[in-house]
């Protein structure tokens, strides 16, 4: 009798819920969240720093000479003619220093066309002294000109010279790392107008046949120190780091290290000492830099500028990877914690796991980890009532409703309650560093280019106008000939010579 009563009770309890235990699936286990693998770490790292001068003062100077040594003896004299030449006299380093102090350039003998340099004074064309005259700037006076005087030697000697004092940015080059952390060799250098490296090993360098550049080097060129900088490691990339206040106006800039863990930025050379974190401490990231200015427009970007931009991109890439790892870490911890809570609460609320995975079912636990999922019938929506499809929601459970006497509903408005507030996100704005520009845009090289262009334009006019066959060249020659007394004398003397020859032939025939 007792067994029959117990069987009836169990049958009633089984029909009290809309779920059945006859077609369960499983077993299942709630697994922990698996973190994705991203090899990025952010640490404070020891670095040795070599600092050179930010700029070095350079004196750029040029000097050359045009000479025309002529003799006119008539058409029958084999010595008649002109010898013309251009000779380059690039100033020495000592001369450039004197030019800068005196504020003027020095040059040699100046003999103008139609002046006093004829006869015995024509030998002044062979005077190669370079310190007889001075001027703030000197250009040729009669470039490619000739001057002839009958039965005399003549000389045209004219010079061009000038100088400019400018500042040239300094950088480290030829960096080679030795066996020790501090064993590094390097060279200080700047760039010429073509972007080629100019080493500062020598106080002066010859730019071309006419031009010399002399540097005013300070006594102490390089200082050495150490600091700690914030770096990203990983992703099969060499470290990318952000410079701190130790680097003065470069604070906040980014630099990418090479395979030897060395890097250069402007007048700084950096070498990582240990390649790893300092006690695993996480670095603090900065995004603002008061020293950054807007990029100068209208100038070409140098390779150095492009490299700096790439370093910013590398930092942004590594930073994104690192931040993603940190986000994954937090999310993973939350998900694992939530998994533990669900695993525990699911043993009390057998419908919890079914609702979380979006199915109508209840959990039937086999032990502390394994369980089966048993299907439940769909009852539809309860809406604002506590009853649906013959079942009632009571004391947190869905049960069979026998008579519906306890069913009720809310007729008024329902106030929503939000458990989570909206979160506003902030993202850093990366600034581009000030562009250095290509070397040919620097003040000193642009000045030299302008001076060379003036010389080219002068010589091009002389060659194209005086040496061509166009209308302009003919007018040019006729204009010069109309004011050339010797040309008129030469024409008449030639005519007289031919007349004397004809008379001599006639007299011989008569005899």
UniProtKB/Swiss-Prot annotation:
<dbReference type="GO" id="GO:0019031">
    <property type="term" value="C:viral envelope"/>
</dbReference>
<dbReference type="GO" id="GO:0055036">
    <property type="term" value="C:virion membrane"/>
</dbReference>
<dbReference type="Pfam" id="PF03273">
    <property type="entry name" value="Baculo_gp64"/>
</dbReference>
<feature type="glycosylation site" description="N-linked (GlcNAc...) asparagine; by host">
    <location>
        <position position="422"/>
    </location>
</feature>
<dbReference type="GO" id="GO:0044003">
    <property type="term" value="P:symbiont-mediated perturbation of host process"/>
</dbReference>
<dbReference type="InterPro" id="IPR004955">
    <property type="entry name" value="Baculovirus_Gp64"/>
</dbReference>
<comment type="function">
    <text>Attaches the virus to host cellular receptor and later induces fusion of virion with host membrane.</text>
</comment>
<keyword id="KW-0946">Virion</keyword>
<keyword id="KW-0812">Transmembrane</keyword>
<feature type="signal peptide">
    <location>
        <begin position="1"/>
        <end position="16"/>
    </location>
</feature>
<feature type="topological domain" description="Cytoplasmic">
    <location>
        <begin position="506"/>
        <end position="511"/>
    </location>
</feature>
<keyword id="KW-0325">Glycoprotein</keyword>
<dbReference type="GO" id="GO:0016020">
    <property type="term" value="C:membrane"/>
</dbReference>
<keyword id="KW-0472">Membrane</keyword>
<protein>
    <recommendedName>
        <fullName>Envelope glycoprotein</fullName>
    </recommendedName>
</protein>
<feature type="glycosylation site" description="N-linked (GlcNAc...) asparagine; by host">
    <location>
        <position position="279"/>
    </location>
</feature>
<keyword id="KW-1133">Transmembrane helix</keyword>
<feature type="topological domain" description="Extracellular">
    <location>
        <begin position="17"/>
        <end position="487"/>
    </location>
</feature>
<keyword id="KW-0732">Signal</keyword>
<feature type="transmembrane region" description="Helical">
    <location>
        <begin position="488"/>
        <end position="505"/>
    </location>
</feature>
């Amino acid at each position: 009798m007792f067994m029959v009563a117990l069987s009836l009770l169990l049958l009633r309890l089984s029909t009290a819920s809309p779920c059945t235990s006859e077609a369960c699936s499983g077993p299942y286990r709630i697994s922990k969240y698996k973190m994705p693998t991203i090899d990025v770490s952010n640490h404070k790292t020891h670095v040795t720093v070599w600092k050179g001068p930010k700029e070095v003062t350079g004196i750029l100077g040029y000097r050359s000479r045009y000479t025309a040594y002529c003799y006119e003896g008539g058409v029958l004299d084999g010595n008649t003619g002109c010898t013309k030449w251009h000779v380059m006299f690039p100033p020495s380093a000592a001369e450039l220093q004197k030019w800068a102090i005196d504020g003027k350039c020095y040059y040699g003998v100046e003999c103008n066309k139609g002046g006093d340099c004829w006869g015995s004074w024509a030998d002044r064309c062979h005077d190669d002294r370079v310190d007889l005259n001075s001027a703030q700037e000197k250009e040729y006076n009669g470039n490619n000109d000739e001057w002839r005087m009958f039965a005399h030697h003549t000389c045209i000697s004219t010079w061009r010279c000038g100088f400019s004092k400018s500042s040239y940015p300094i950088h480290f080059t030829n960096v080679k790392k030795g066996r020790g952390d501090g064993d590094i060799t390097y060279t200080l250098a700047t760039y010429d107008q073509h972007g080629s490296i100019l080493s500062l090993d020598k106080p002066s360098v010859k730019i071309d046949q006419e031009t010399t550049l002399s540097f005013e080097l300070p006594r102490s060129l390089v200082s050495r120190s150490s600091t700690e900088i914030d770096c990203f490691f990983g992703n099969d990339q060499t470290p990318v780091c952000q410079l701190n206040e130790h680097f003065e106006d470069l604070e906040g800039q980014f630099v990418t290290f090479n395979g030897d863990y060395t890097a250069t930025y402007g007048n700084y050379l950096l070498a990582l000492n240990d390649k790893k974190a300092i006690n695993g401490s996480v670095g603090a990231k900065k995004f603002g830099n008061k020293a950054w200015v807007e990029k100068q427009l209208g100038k070409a970007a140098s390779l150095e500028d492009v490299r700096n931009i790439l370093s910013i991109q590398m930092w942004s890439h590594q930073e994104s990877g690192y931040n993603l790892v940190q986000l994954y870490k937090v999310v993973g911890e939350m998900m694992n914690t939530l998994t533990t809570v669900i695993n525990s609460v699911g043993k009390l609320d057998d419908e919890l796991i079914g609702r979380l995975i979006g199915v109508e079912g209840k959990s039937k636990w086999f032990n502390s980890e394994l369980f089966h999922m048993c299907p439940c019938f769909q009852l539809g929506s309860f809406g604002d009532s506590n009853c649906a499809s013959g079942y009632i929601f009571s004391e947190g459970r869905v049960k069979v409703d026998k008579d519906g006497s306890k069913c009720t509903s809310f007729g008024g408005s329902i106030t929503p309650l939000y458990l989570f507030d909206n979160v506003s996100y902030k993202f850093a704005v990366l600034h581009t560093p000030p562009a250095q520009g290509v070397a040919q845009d620097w003040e000193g090289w642009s000045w030299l280019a302008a001076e060379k262009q003036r010389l080219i334009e002068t010589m091009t006019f002389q060659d194209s106008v005086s040496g061509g066959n166009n209308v302009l060249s003919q007018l040019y020659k006729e204009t010069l000939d109309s004011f050339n007394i010797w040309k008129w004398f030469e024409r008449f003397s030639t005519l007289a010579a031919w007349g004397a020859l004809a008379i001599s032939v006639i007299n011989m025939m008569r005899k």
